[in-house]
A protein has these predicted regions:
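Flexible propeptides and autoinhibitory/regulatory segments associated with cysteine proteases
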Residues: 56-157, 296, 437, 442-443, ...
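C-terminal or internal capping secondary-structure element at the end of a domain, subdomain, or sheet
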Residues: 448, 452-473
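Membrane-interface helical sensory segment of bacterial ECF anti-sigma factor regulators
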Residues: 1-4, 16-66
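Exposed beta-sheet edge/beta-hairpin loop segments within beta-rich domains
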Residues: 251-252, 443-450
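Short beta-strands and strand-coil junctions in structured, solvent-facing domains, enriched
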Residues: 333-334, 464
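Short, surface-exposed beta-strand/strand-loop-strand elements in extracellular ectodomains
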Residues: 156-161, 279
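Short alpha-helix boundary/capping elements
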Residues: 14-18, 145-150, 199-203, 269
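Non-catalytic, conformational "gating/processing" segments within enzyme and secreted inhibitor domains
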Residues: 60-80, 86, 128, 135-138, ...
Length: 473
């Protein structure tokens, strides 16, 4: 467990934990599903700009070419599984080495991605309505695209992702994917990517191999634009997003498509500490469009309160090892002001934010369900990725020599919702207190009331899975 995770765990101690310990009475709790699920799909479509490549003369319904492997599970070895002490110690040292390498590559990746995540959020989360995007889904799509491109097209993407070459990118993508991935029954954080190739066109096998091995990408082939293949793509997206985006289906492909790339995130987890529905109440939320009545949830807990130049923030722990940040702009400061500064993203990515203190926070959080489908094209062009959108400049020769293709569109559909599921949860008191004792002094209480536009970030191991602005819960 890294220092940041340990600090988060030790500082999140609810009053209910203290009360329960004093009474020595077990209780059952309701639990919240964060995102009765949260999900996102980034869709990258590249279309032919010439008709010189051979057209397929037969129809197939998306034949499977390659299926991505399961993420590496670097589980701690059990001594009972080894015949000798030396064999166990060797396995243990290998485990620690692999964990350290993954952690190092992830930190390198996040250092390089900080600007993209912050600047992308400022570009994609605009307007007075609710806004949402998935930084990690966009990252996985762009990283895969870098592997398939060449020349200046590739250099522009690599620069945006903060790396110099695809060898480094492969290591970092694997570490991001594996760090963000969790599958604990009802508590999940799953990433998936698929590449759909046009039947009848040959492609570079080494690039396909790299996508499968290092990017955890499944590769399919079919008649792009056909009813059968379109249905297969829709089924794949729905399966990997828990059917949460069924109202935002993938765009219909046309027969001149060369390949299509889809990257998804599916997230579902329960709070470590519950919000009891009996404490819900209705009150005013000060939306840019005018005051409106919304349903609020309430809870009080001992946790870390972070300060930025123009915002305050708290984070709540989740059962799958993730955290959800709630970022409240100061009075007379807008969500856009916070987004433009980018400091909040530094805080989310930080291993140890300097301006923080342990407080008793009386939380008041509105229930919300935010969903959006948007184009990422204009924002990516502002961030310096331009050639892939030009029929004259796009270079995808890494996938196939002299492949006459360009990016026709990049769309992303996302949804995040938080509410009470009313399901009984497990005890969490021992986990929170493990390895530490509560402070002797009672912290000063604060009221953290999200009754005006605010930001949120859902992160796993400091990797921002979802970033959004709630203007109208």
């Amino acid at each position: 467990m890294d220092r940041n995770t340990l600090n988060k765990a030790l500082t999140y101690i609810s009053d209910q934990h203290i009360s329960a310990a004093a009474k020595r009475k077990r209780r059952h709790s309701h639990w919240i599903t964060v995102t009765a699920a949260a999900t996102a799909a980034a869709i990258l479509l590249l279309v032919m700009v010439q008709t010189t490549l051979p057209k397929p003369t037969f129809s197939v319904a998306a034949n499977t070419a390659r299926i991505a492997p399961s993420p590496r599970n670097i589980a701690f070895p059990l001594q009972a599984d080894y015949e000798t002490e030396d064999a166990f110690q060797y396995a243990r040292e290998n485990h620690l080495s692999l964990q350290a390498e993954r952690r190092l590559q992830k930190e390198y990746a996040l250092n390089g991605l900080a600007a993209f995540f912050a600047e992308g959020s400022a570009l994609f989360l605009t307007g007075e309505e609710n806004a949402l995007w998935s930084p990690v889904s966009a990252y996985m799509s762009l990283a895969s695209l870098a592997e398939l491109s060449s020349g200046r097209s590739q250099r522009q993407i690599l620069k945006l992702l903060g790396v110099n070459n695809t060898n480094t990118l492969r290591k970092q993508v694997s570490s991001i994917f594996e760090s963000a991935y969790a599958d604990k029954g009802k508590d999940v954080s799953k990433l998936a990517t698929s590449l759909w190739l046009q039947e009848g066109i040959s492609y570079q096998d080494d690039k396909i191999d790299a996508l499968v091995k290092d990017y955890y990408t499944s590769v399919y082939s079919g008649i792009l634009g056909s009813t059968e293949t379109q249905q297969a793509i829709t089924d794949w997206v729905n399966t990997n997003t828990g059917d949460l985006l069924s109202d935002y289906p993938p765009d219909q492909l046309t027969t001149d498509a060369v390949f299509a790339l889809y990257s998804t995130v599916y997230f579902q987890s329960q709070w470590k500490d519950d919000f009891d529905a009996k404490f819900n109440f209705s009150d005013i939320f000060h939306s840019p469009a005018g005051d409106r009545d919304v349903t609020y949830m309430r809870n009080s807990a001992r946790m870390t309160y972070c300060r930025g130049d123009n915002f305050g923030a708290v984070y709540l722990p989740l059962e799958n090892g993730s955290y959800m940040w709630f970022i409240l702009p100061d009075e007379n400061t807008t969500a856009q002001d916070v987004l433009r500064s980018g400091q909040y993203m530094d805080m989310v990515l930080s291993q140890n934010w300097e301006d923080q203190q342990t407080v008793i926070a009386h939380l008041t959080i509105p229930k919300f369900d935010v969903a959006e489908k948007k184009s990422l094209k204009d924002g990516l062009m502002q961030l310096g990725v331009t050639d892939i959108f030009s029929a004259d400049k796009a270079n995808f020769s890494a996938l196939r020599s002299e492949l006459p293709a360009f990016a026709g569109s990049i769309q992303q559909a996302s949804r995040v919702q938080i509410d009470e599921a009313g399901v009984t949860g497990a005890s969490y008191t021992e986990i929170i207190y493990m390895g530490s004792t509560p402070p002797s002094d009672t912290p000063e209480p604060i009221d953290f009331i999200l009754d005006r536009p605010f930001l949120f970030v859902v992160e796993k191991d400091n990797i921002p899975l979802f970033t959004g602005v709630v203007n109208e819960p």
